[in-house]
Amino acid sequence: TVSKEDKEKTIGCTGIYYANSMIPQGELELEKIVHSFAAKKFLNSYLLKEGVKEEKLNEELLKVVDIRYGKPYEDETTKKCDEFIFKLISGSKDEIKKIAESGIY
């Protein structure tokens, strides 16, 4: 089971990935956009499995997106989320990579 704190941090990171995935392609390398899409998709499923209600999740994600929308990509913030998620959820790095490579977001 994931602690409440880790769950909240995961939701925060999911929101960051979501916001990143909305950055126009000309402003950010496609690879980073695709990684963010894949991470958002993976974490969405993960959080629902962990018992987060879909409505609450969407609400929380939109809060993060509202704050970050239109702001430039933050490498440091995204890297910290990657590290946190890869450590928290075993196999997540490979799963996210698989989603990114499958081209299905």
Give the positions of each predicted feature.
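Short N-proximal segments of mature Sec-exported proteins
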Residues: 2-51
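Compact alpha-helical subdomains of small soluble proteins
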Residues: 30-105
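A broad "ordered helical/assembly scaffold" signature
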Residues: 1-2, 96
